Amino acid sequence: MNIKNNHLVIMAGGVGSRFWPMSTPDYPKQFIDVLGCGRTLIQLTADRFQGICPPENIWVVTSEKYADTVKEQLPDIADDHILREPCRRNTAPCIAYVSWKIKARNPKANMVVTPSDHIVMNIAEFQRVINSAMNFTADSDAILTLGMKPTRPETGYGYIEADLSVPSTANKEVFRVYSFKEKPDLETARRYIQKNNFFWNAGIFVWNVNTVVNALRVYQPAISKVFERLFPYYYTDKEQEMINQNFPLCENISVDYAIMEKADEIFVLPASFGWSDRGTWGSLHENLPKDAHNNTQIGENIKLYETRNCVIHTTQEKRVVVQGLDGYIVAEKNNTLLICRLSEEQRIKEFSAE
């Protein structure tokens, strides 16, 4: 594998509505220091690919409204590597756009595509897995996805069912995908994890650029025609104008439905590196360190009394004192304070819309 051909694509167009009030449509969670470590989620995402993908091969696909924020937080990325979507069309058009643009400059490119708002605790193992995956796809026609080894019967993730009977001859860590499963109910999730060949779908994909472009041509010809028509305009002054005119013509469809569930050569690399998509306050509470009373605290000036099983998140200098709560979210940002039962956090979207 030639590292000069390795390209990282970060998808950063989401609005993070489940993480309100820290995350808002104007400033979603990928641009926030969720962990209180001094780095935002998108910065941490770029950080963990150091040594795998050269800095000049990093791409971010985002909304036009977030492009300036991306540049502020990742200043070393070239302007023409920040792709501005004029509207939201899910992950298939997003991946198609960046794939055709990369192919225009490097037809030998090997790509890893990742969301911008995930957390990885074991960086060394993550990098080992990514290197293994990219070695597998560099010279093959395979489409590879990472499958997280489940630690609990989770209903918030889709699942990948793998055929573990025979590993790939090219990489003993890689197995064929038998099927993709939608987010299950609790009973089904329990059944999945008992079988040992079901993995969480992390939404991290690895392939070479010719493989993904050819797959899009076969399974999504309408989307492919849009970006093939734009081929002469990539890296020119006309690119954004043509994208603004043509991108909205694409179907709103995820890459899972567009390619992954249709193609034949789909593989999974099962992995375990302390992964979480941190999509909810509950997952934040579950994965971060806790005090003796099972509270997660992020903030400089928090005092807790007779409080258990809570997640407290503040970003300002305000003093926060909590007494007598059990199982609550307490989150404060700007002029908004949220106090909500952890068990009812699915209602946060409802609260944020009011």
Task: Walk through the language-model features, giving the residues of each.
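Left-handed beta-helix
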Residues: 2-5, 209-354
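General beta-strand structural signal in soluble alpha/beta enzymes
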Residues: 60, 83-84, 113, 144-148, ...
